[in-house]
């Protein structure tokens, strides 16, 4: 174990030869913190909201919590596509801003927004069409002892999926727009909006 740790330290030490903390400029650190902290707070507010929803459902009962977890898992899975587009928007918009190519920046931003709207609309439609079927994928329907509980979970989860279908589109657009704003280095106003929303 020690030999492996020593080998790893030796491998990485080549990257830090002649490194000094004096090389790090305070102005650059300040800029990174001014961009990173509001973005981190933004994500914290969103995660805290979903965590609070799970906690509240847990206090209501296990069937509500199970149904909420099913709907949240499905919504979060489809939300990852929008998160990927958000990263794309951040990179592409930031790149075009750095090149001062504002015409292409607008084209890129609109393209990513449109792609997010199309994808999230498709997911929303699938949630509406399959809202009674999707909860079955998460439950053991062969267990005779849980038939009544499973039916209750399916009823609640199917209703929650209809709600998720609606907020799927707005949530997808919101995260992609925030990614584009991050690319423009505009992070403080979105942080306040996320806090109050």
Describe these PLM feature segments.
Residues 12-17, 42-45, 89, 171-174:
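Juxtamembrane/interfacial segments around transmembrane helices
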């Amino acid at each position: 174990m020690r030999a492996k740790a020593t080998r790893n330290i030796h491998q990485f030490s080549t990257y830090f030869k002649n490194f000094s903390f004096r090389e790090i400029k305070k102005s650059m650190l300040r800029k990174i913190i001014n961009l990173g902290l509001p973005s981190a707070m933004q994500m914290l507010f969103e995660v805290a909201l979903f965590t609070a929803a799970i906690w509240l459902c847990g206090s209501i009962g296990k069937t509500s919590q199970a149904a909420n977890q099913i709907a949240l898992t499905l919504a979060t899975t489809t939300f990852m596509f929008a998160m990927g587009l958000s990263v794309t928007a951040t990179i592409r918009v930031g790149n075009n801003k750095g090149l001062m190519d504002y015409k292409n920046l607008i084209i890129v931003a609109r393209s990513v927004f449109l792609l997010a709207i199309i994808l999230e609309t498709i997911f929303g439609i699938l949630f509406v069409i399959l809202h009674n079927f999707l909860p079955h994928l998460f439950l053991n329907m062969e267990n005779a002892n849980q038939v009544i509980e499973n039916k209750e979970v399916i009823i609640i989860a199917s209703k929650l999926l209809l709600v998720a279908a609606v907020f799927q589109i707005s949530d997808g657009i919101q995260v992609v727009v925030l990614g584009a704003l991050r690319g423009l280095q505009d992070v403080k106003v979105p942080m306040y909006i996320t806090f109050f929303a």
